[in-house]
């Protein structure tokens, strides 16, 4: 019996890391991105723009068991965030990928929170209503959360670990902030991938 089938929508660095981890556990991995040349050879790649509704709908036949949505803004304005985060999830709903028999994990951002003064945030902290781009991300989250599917949302912040990277290079060169009390909220790419893979594995196990 084959393992679960995962479709990674917008498969960049994080998606590839997650897919490779799950592939070693017997999962079948399909990956959607504009260019498939950089995808791991273990993946079945589909060269599409996931923000193109018709292109995304054309792959409805894949019928995944699980979906990992790793979106990126398609521009710095609000419309770019809507195209990257909100609109594709609406399409996933129309093609049946948000039904109760599918598990969906979305990698979101802590940008959705209202806190801007360095305070602590939790899953229940207030969300911003003043940042239109963050609201567009929230709208994508809401589509997933209101769908029949099981849809955990991972709100990450400050990804690092892709070389060369500014944070790693600053540490290597001994560059420090002039503010000794400055706190940086970051997560390593491998850690985020481990979390996402762990969530998907638990979902597959019925947890």
Q: Residues of each region from the PLM?
A:
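Glycine-rich "substrate-gating" loop/helix at the edge of Rossmann-like oxidoreductase active sites
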Residues: 128-131, 157-158, 162, 179-187
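Glycine/proline-rich active-site loop of Rossmann-fold NAD(P)-dependent oxidoreductases
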Residues: 135-138, 147, 159-172, 198-207
